[in-house]
């Protein structure tokens, strides 16, 4: 369960930022999580609930924004969600590049 190590890193980063801001409490964390990031959002939430205990993030809410995968045809530039077929519907090419959907980013946090 690599979500535990991700949650640990997330909380450690948030705690460091909170100390820098001289905050007393972390209220919420907003995370951008791509659908192709290879991270189970519910497992991450569970791991976060374990790691946040006994810290100034103990009552923090984890808000996860899901980022859908988006591909771009490398031949014609057509943007598309994950292609169901191997060929681009616009030009017939099978050369795709993932443009978004692998994000795992702490977008913002609220502290007091």
Swiss-Prot record:
Q: Which domain of life is it from?
A: Bacteria
A Gene Ontology molecular function term of the record: zinc ion binding
Q: Where does Zn(2+) bind?
A: 73, 76, 88, 91
Q: Does the keyword Cytoplasm apply?
A: no
Task: Report any Pfam family annotated for this entry.
Answer: HypA
Q: Which InterPro entries match?
A: Hydgase_Ni_incorp_HypA/HybF_CS (IPR020538), HypA/HybF (IPR000688)
Residues reported to bind Ni(2+):
2
Keywords tagged on the record: Metal-binding, Nickel, Zinc
Could you tell me the Gene Ontology terms of the biological process aspect for this record? Answer: protein maturation; protein modification process
- PANTHER family found in the cross-reference section: HYDROGENASE MATURATION FACTOR HYPA
Task of the protein: Involved in the maturation of [NiFe] hydrogenases. Required for nickel insertion into the metal center of the hydrogenase.
Q: Which family does it belong to?
A: Belongs to the HypA/HybF family.
Which HAMAP family has this protein been placed in? HypA_HybF
What is the name of this protein?
Hydrogenase maturation factor HypA
| Species per Swiss-Prot/TrEMBL record | Synechococcus elongatus (strain ATCC 33912 / PCC 7942 / FACHB-805) (Anacystis nidulans R2)
């Amino acid at each position: 369960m690599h979500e535990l190590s991700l949650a640990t890193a997330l909380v450690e980063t948030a705690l460091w930022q909170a100390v820098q801001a001289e905050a007393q409490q972390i209220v919420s964390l907003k995370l951008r999580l791509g659908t192709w990031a290879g991270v189970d959002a519910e497992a991450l939430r569970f791991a976060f609930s374990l790691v946040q205990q006994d810290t100034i993030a103990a009552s923090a809410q984890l808000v996860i924004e899901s980022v859908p995968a988006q591909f771009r045809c490398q031949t014609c530039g057509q943007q598309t969600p994950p292609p169901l077929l191997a060929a681009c519907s616009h030009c017939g090419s099978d050369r795709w590049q993932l443009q978004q959907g692998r994000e795992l980013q702490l977008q913002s946090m609220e502290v007091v």
